[in-house]
Design a protein with these regions (language model features):
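Conserved RNA-binding domains used in RNP assembly and mRNA/RNA metabolism
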Residues: 1-74
Length: 74
């Protein structure tokens, strides 16, 4: 993972991010940790696919399932 991506993700720890997955699901949660494979741990997580909200609590997302990460504005 490039240092630019690491710096962006590092600045988002403890902030809410949205993640688009390969299976067309969209996940929103608070970023807790990440690694060099872009595996992410999130808490207070919600699946917001198809305008339905499902609470997931704490999850680990494998980096190879992530298509896009939407970072907060600040």
């Amino acid at each position: 993972m490039s240092s630019e991506i690491v710096n962006m993700l590092d600045g988002c720890v403890n902030k809410v991010i949205m993640i688009k997955l390969r299976n067309n699901r969209t996940i929103r949660g608070t970023l807790q940790t990440f690694d060099t494979h872009m595996n992410l741990t999130l808490n207070k997580t919600e699946d917001i696919t198809d305008d339905k909200v499902e609470n997931l609590d704490n999850i680990l997302l494998r980096g190879d399932n992530i298509i896009a990460v939407h970072l907060p504005d600040n």
